Amino acid sequence: MCSMWLMASWLMAFVAGSTLADYCGDHKVPFGMEVHKNGNVNILCSRPSCHEKKYAECPERATSTTCSTNSSWVGGVTQHSDGSLRLMCCEYDLLPTYSTIQYEKLTIRTGEYFEGDEQMEGDVVTAFDLIGNIEQVKEPDGKYSYNLLIYRYHCGNIPDTPPAWYMKKQWPYWEK
């Protein structure tokens, strides 16, 4: 009887502390977000052809409540069992240079989604949208809505060399 109670307690602790996570990694960008009817959040990731050789610096976990710098985007989300959302803020030094704000406060609610645009000239991607920040707002009915900051990234004359911090993480690395 005691072992059954322990197993039930362990199961309750596991379920109560569960989280849902979704991430793009350091080679992809978040171009969309979906809020399911049950409140679960997913981000949609892509690697546009004009961004194939570009890298962002992302932390190991989503622990931030906001991605507040103009050189960061949301590289992942963790949704806790209480509904709270944590963000993985990836830093990309060239973001302020090559992007403009497309939408400052685009709101999506339960059952809705946002999917960014890709601008094309023939077969070449010239610009794409990405999520720079997600602000979680608790509505009066207890559900959450999300305000998105959307950047339009203009591929233009982007340098093909990875940033210096990325090169230092590659093995072997020697100072010149």
UniProtKB/Swiss-Prot annotation:
It comes from the Eukaryota. Residues 1-21 form the signal peptide. Expressed in seam cells, excretory cell, reproductive system, pharynx, pharyngeal-intestinal valve cells, neurons and neuronal support cells. InterPro entries: Dev_Signal_Hedgehog-like. GO terms for cellular component: extracellular region. Disruption phenotype: Worms either die at embryonic or larval stages (43%), or exhibit variable abnormal morphology. The keyword Glycoprotein applies. It is found in: Secreted. Keywords: Developmental protein, Glycoprotein, Secreted, Signal. The keyword Secreted applies. GO terms for biological process: cell communication. GO terms for molecular function: signaling receptor binding. Glycans are attached at residue 70. Transmembrane segments: none annotated. Intercellular signal essential for a variety of patterning events during development. This is Warthog protein 5. It comes from Caenorhabditis elegans. The lineage of its organism: Eukaryota, Metazoa, Ecdysozoa, Nematoda, Chromadorea.
